[in-house]
Amino acid sequence: ETDRINFTTAEQIHTGWDHAANAYYAGELGKWNIDFNADYLFKRSHSDQNAMNNDDATVQADSRMRSSLYAAKLVVSAPLWNGRFSFGTEETFTNRHDIFTQNGFSADADDHIKQSVYAAFADYSRSIRHWKLNMGIRYEHQQTDYYEKGIRIDAQSPTYNDIIPVLAASWSHNGKSFSLSYRLRKNNPDYS
């Protein structure tokens, strides 16, 4: 006698609306140029998975995800000492929450990650005869908070405070040019 196994898999994905909003302003106030932009994104998803073995539910899984992003940047600039001075701020906030539950084939997961980045910067550029000079500085504060089942995991929740300089000089005359620059680049670990 042979046992017969009928195995059926079904997945149901619940989709909803993704939301995106953008605001932008570019204008002048006296000698000051103002450039502002902001973005907001929101997304969520829900997926049910069921695997049947001879009409018995053998594997059930439920996956839910919710994420949002807000980002904004403001740059203000004006002439200063025969050059151009600009300063501004930049902010980014992300929030993602993933919940995965099932009936015993692997561990449940409830992961939540939030990240905030605040930055302030200033830049000055000036042309002197055949030279163009530029210098700037940026301060950046980055805070990441990672939670498993509502408990903050300190080892995966770093905070960074960085000062990032930029220096550049270029020369151009009679079709010849030369450039020298220094920039400190920051590479953050990936998170997903």
Listing of model-derived features with the role each one plays in the protein:
Residues Y147-A155:
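Eukaryotic, compositionally biased intrinsically disordered regions
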Residues S63-R64, D162-I164:
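Short, surface-exposed, polar/charged, turn-prone segments marking secondary-structure boundaries
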Residues T9-E148, S172:
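Face-selective signature of the C-terminal outer-membrane beta-barrel domain
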Residues L74, A122, I163-A169, L180:
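Feature captures outer-membrane beta-barrel proteins of Gram-negative bacteria and organelles
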